[in-house]
Amino acid sequence: MATEDVPFEERKERLKEAFRTSRGYFDEVWDEIIGLDLDFFEQYEKFSSVPWHHGALDPKTKELIAIGLNASVTHMYMPGVRAHIRQALKFGATRQEIMEVFQLVSVLGVHSLTVGLPIFVEELKRAEHEKDS
């Protein structure tokens, strides 16, 4: 049976189950996306599940990394942080391990300083030079 011949709700449930099978859960975060575009979600599920089917990292480590990715200042996706904390705990992550992820990812924010501070120093020098001219 071709994909287009499968009723929407049936295909939606199959895709949710495929995600559950691959990742061990299906969070409500995905409901809106899967409801809007089944084809996109199907491709996302295939792509994002590759590390779950192959690779050297255990599931707990993968979930800890996912927490860091979702919590990073470049993403800050709180529903993802919550979903991956739940999964990490199910895989045996400790409070200390999860806290260490937050400590590690917080260092990303230092780039605001390392980018901004040299510009600030340059502008201070420029302002001083203009003042003296």
Q: Which residues fall in each region the model found?
A:
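Alpha-helix C-capping/helix-to-loop hinge sites
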Residues: 50-54, 68-72, 88, 105-108
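Alpha-helical scaffolds flanking conserved acidic
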Residues: 59-64, 95-100
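Short acidic/histidine-centered micro-motifs embedded in hydrophobic/aromatic stretches
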Residues: 67-68, 101-104, 123
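Mid-chain, well-packed structural core segment of small domains
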Residues: 73-99
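C-terminal structural segments of small proteins and small subunits
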Residues: 108-117
